[in-house]
């Protein structure tokens, strides 16, 4: 028989360990993993009893959660609605409010913006993954096939460094890496050889955009500082969008039209 609550007495006198609450927190965090491990290992009658116990615990937990959620749940009130009552969202129906005018202005601006970025090639042919990538076999016995060789033109940027070849999933060959493009200004009817700053959007897939793959219809950002274009406030325009209009992998060069 126990001769006294000596543990509780010691805690009252000297307090707990400095890391006690941290240990308790970690123990509770590990509890779920421990339970899972036991449930996976246990077999036979023990498994049946354990599963029955967990089933009842979960049912109890669901009831408790439901009780707590009752406070936040919104229910339809039984009170009768008075005659002539108008809901809050219909209160401003009498006159056109300032908010509505602003909303219409915003919509109009969006329409203008959408029209502003009409592109020369609104639709392009879909490119299959087999056409875009070539499977590269690797490993001692050439049995691994997780590497891909990009067969289209790419842009990798100025400070690009390859990953170690052993771990590189997408191989972008040096011969298909381009840094410049022939960009035609639609209003000036003249072509300029400009630096590519980045690949903004490849219409095929976000993955290709991330890899910097350039296909027909891709939107590029090009350096137009040499053209001397200025904004309405007088600032020099540095980068502008252009859409690729040819198949660079076939032609060996990138032809694009500037989006003015």
Curated annotation (Swiss-Prot):
In the record, biological process GO terms are:
maturation of 5.8S rRNA; maturation of LSU-rRNA
Q: Which domain of life is it from?
A: Eukaryota
Motif, Nuclear localization signal: chain positions: 11-18
Question: According to its UniProt record, where is this protein located?
Answer: Nucleus, Nucleolus
The terms describing its cellular component in GO are: nucleolus; preribosome, large subunit precursor
Question: Which PANTHER family does this one have?
Answer: RIBOSOME BIOGENESIS PROTEIN NSA2 HOMOLOG
What protein am I looking at? Ribosome biogenesis protein NSA2 homolog
Annotated gene: nsa2
């Amino acid at each position: 028989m126990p001769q006294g609550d000596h543990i509780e007495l010691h805690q009252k006198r000297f307090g707990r360990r400095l890391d006690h609450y941290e240990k308790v927190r970690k123990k509770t965090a590990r509890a779920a993993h421990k339970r899972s491990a036991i449930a996976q290992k246990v077999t036979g009658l023990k498994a049946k009893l354990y599963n029955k116990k967990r089933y009842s615990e979960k049912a109890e937990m669901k009831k408790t959660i439901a009780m707590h959620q009752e406070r936040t749940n919104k229910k339809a009130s039984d009170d009768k609605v008075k005659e002539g009552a108008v809901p809050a969202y219909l209160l401003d129906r009498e006159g056109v409010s300032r908010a509505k005018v602003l909303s219409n202005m915003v919509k109009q601006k969006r329409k203008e913006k959408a029209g502003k970025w009409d592109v020369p090639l609104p639709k392009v042919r879909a490119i299959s993954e087999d056409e875009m990538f070539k499977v590269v076999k690797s490993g001692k016995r050439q049995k691994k096939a997780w590497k891909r060789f990009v067969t289209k033109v790419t842009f990798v940027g100025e400070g690009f460094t390859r990953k170690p070849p052993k771990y590189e999933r997408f191989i972008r060959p040096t011969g298909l890496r381009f840094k410049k493009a022939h960009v035609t200004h639609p209003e000036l009817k003249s072509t300029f050889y400009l630096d590519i700053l980045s690949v903004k959007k490849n219409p095929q897939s976000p993955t290709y955009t991330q890899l910097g793959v350039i296909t027909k219809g891709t939107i590029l950002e090009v350096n137009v500082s040499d053209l001397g274009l200025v904004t309405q406030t007088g600032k020099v325009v540095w980068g502008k969008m252009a859409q690729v209009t040819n198949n660079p992998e076939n032609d060996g060069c990138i032809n694009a039209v500037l989006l003015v």
